[in-house]
Amino acid sequence: GKSAATPKQQAPSKQTSKPAAKKKAASGGININLPFLGGSKIKQKELTIITRQLATLIGSGLPLLRALKVLEQQRKGGAAKVLSKVASEIEQGALFSEALAKFPSSFPKIYVAMVKAGEAGGALESVLSRLAEFMEKEAKLKGKIKSAMAYPAVVVVVMIGILTFIMVKIVPTFTKIFEDMEVGDLPATTVLLIKISKLMAERSYLIVAFIFGLVILYRVATKIKFTKYLIDKVKLRLFIFGPVISKTIIARFARTFATLITSGVPILQSLQIVRDTVGNEVIANAINEIRNRVREGEGISGIMLRTGAFPPMVTNMIAVGEETGAMDAMLEKVADAYEAEVDAAVAAMTSMLEPILIVCLGVVVGFIVISLFMPLIKIALSLSGGAGEGGGGGGE
């Protein structure tokens, strides 16, 4: 049908593409993309909308190049610039997938691979619709986790605010009282509390620098393959958070793999893309092992089972998919099942986090109160003892 027309079929003749080529040469070959300065980039949410609209326009019979120009006119900023450049590449004879591949910051590997498969199979419209659906589900999953984490995050921020106020304002007041009353031996907990309070009040820059240093160290560690593997392994085993992280990764793996296979992307290339986008080095290593073994002719489910990185339900369902020739459908079912499990895991996580955070706040505040009032109780007891002795002496 019309939707199956490839970009090369819609590309103008060489005569019409020459001015565009000259214009490109005149503008210079350097393309600086600085997203933080508002550079040319399409955000994920906007890309989903553009993909859905592009599928609709192509499905309505509009040629690809014209559809891109229609979308370009509807957009502003970085998205309009990228769409304009993609259209320009197609005008010069490039395939749609080739044009997209030149803008990796806007179009991820999975996007380019699926478009390429759609071009080869003459089903660009259906592939774009599938891509849009995939991105919508991915965004929905991320949104659920973010919204679930919003309340605990607010509670943590409030806790930090309360504790900072106590340490910076309340503790120094008590410290002055102790000094004015010339309290001698303070309990060890009180001394520790006063030292922390002075550090926060007088050398707050050291605390900020320490936190900043930890963030940088974490960023650097995630760039090194070995340390990233260790960090990702710890993430999967984290108390409360671990189940949510592992289920989210399995859901992403299954959904991405299913979408790629359904779109006609070759199995080895699909595994490569899934490995690069899964977001966890432990699972990525397992997928890499699967890819290497599949290249040698082995079945996927057997290798998955041997890696130990995937739950038995996943490997069994994929085994059934291999036997029946419907692995894409089975992967979709795995993704649906695990996305539902993510919802349950997130609900369990938030219900557990709330009381834990309250208990933690109570313990810290309790420690502060006891540390501050122990010297006062000691002073009160010594004063009452002194008053009693004085009263006894007066009676004699």
Regions flagged by a language model, labelled:
Residues 7, 12-17, 85-121, 290-324:
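Short, non-transmembrane cytosolic segments of multipass membrane proteins
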Residues 71-74, 103, 277:
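Alpha-helical solenoid scaffolds that mediate protein-protein interactions
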Residues 58, 90, 101, 119, ...:
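Short polybasic/polar patches that bind polyanions
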Residues 1-88:
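N-terminal anchoring/assembly modules that precede and organize ATP-driven motor systems
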Residues 64, 96, 267:
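Helix-turn-helix DNA-binding elements, focusing on the entry/boundary residues of the two helices
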Residues 18-48, 53, 79, 123-316, ...:
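Low-polarity contexts
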Residues 61, 93, 264:
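Core nucleotide-handling region used for phosphoryl-transfer chemistry
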